[in-house]
Amino acid sequence: MTHAATAPPEPAPTPAGLDAGFERAARAAGGPVDLRLAVAGSAVRVRFAGTTAADALGRAFAHLVTARDDAPALTLHVWDSVERPAFAAGRPSEAETPTTGAGPSYFYDELEFRALHQPASDVLSVLSADGAAGWFWMPDATRLPYWEYSAPFRHLLSWCLDAQGCRQVHGGAVGTKDGGALIVGPGGSGKSTTALASLLDERLRYAGDDYVAVGGEREPFVHSLYCAAKVHHDDVHRLPHLEAALADGDRADEKAVLYVATAFPGRSIAGFPLRAIVLPRVTDRRTARIVPASHAAALAALAPSTIFQLHPPAREALARMADLVRTLPSFVLELGADVETIPAELVRLLERLD
């Protein structure tokens, strides 16, 4: 998924107008539905306008739900409606709408808030200047592209995490409570295959396949954001342990979406210390093998897609990711035809680094 930030096509939204739009939608849907989460050590309250939006977008956070009633660091207001907020220009025609990524975006950053409209998926994300309030609008919660279900509110969370000293990155992560690996690479490199293959081994826990957050002052620590995963339909046969659990998309060009916390109870994890950076690479080998990689290769696999997809301040984000790859050893995971050999290689690596 790539993005090109441009000037806003319409007048900017206002927090008051967004609040009013949410309240109207909530009343029409029978009232708000609240979801309380613990995200990267912070309390987050998500207010959905009705059960339809909550059911559609809340499943990706099932492993982060908490019964604690702490004051939220961030409150998100999530609704769908025919009425369009300011700044959300009309969606392009079907011929112009990308089917395999989020396409270009319109970004707006002012003293009072920042906003991002993605015409391809037709969603609007707005965050207040203090990072305490966010708004996420969509025209229909039941008709979003697959990537919005697998990684809801990713830009809002990225902006908020930045203020807390965490960096959301384009990568997956698997490991144990004692330590794990960040899995990085461009689309098609095997990140999801590697992360989902870990479910074959009871020793490993799943923290994400596409977006996670990295923080930690004394040692790098990965925070899970989503328990959802995406699988190309053409790859399902290589991961037969997932077939019964896949929530299939309704278009032939979609990836299938899997909710790990539901399909594999106890296998999702909120986070762990980072021990290594792993770069999957598709090869013609039969079995998987791990070999050393350079810090430069790790940065090249991590930074470009993170910056293009999540819109962080590029210079600062690049510096922080460069610091991260200098801190950790990096390895290439040569993927073979036998996917079931992947988790054993990861376990051996983590045991060696422990």
What feature does the model see in each segment?
Residues 2-187, 197-207, 212-354:
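A noncatalytic interaction/capping subdomain that flanks phosphate/NTP-handling catalytic cores
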Residues 194:
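Hydrophobic positions on the alpha1 helix immediately C-terminal to the Walker A/P-loop
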Residues 189-191:
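Conserved glycine(s) of the Walker
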